[in-house]
Amino acid sequence: MMTPESVCAERGIDLVYFDGRDTDKKGIYNKRANMIAVNAYLDDVQYRKVVYHEIGHVDHDPSQYDRRREQYELQADRNMIHYLVKEVSICHNSRLKY
């Protein structure tokens, strides 16, 4: 079964958690550390969305983020959607097998 944790492990990305109760941040990707930090207080759906979105930033150049913010965020959102659809497809296919 595909999970955010398994995708991070396959890509060599460390996944850590932070206490996000006093911030509006849900997650962040740190390229130098190749690490995704996720708010530990997200529900399961938000957690999956955030991790998959942050994975979408892996190939982005942090020095270009201010200039290309909209493009980078849209690419990260597409990445999130890709993984969520893949999860649903895997789940659906496993239910079809008797």
Feature locations, PLM:
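Active-site hotspot residues in diverse enzymes, especially metal/ion-binding acidic/histidine motifs
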Residues: M1-Y98
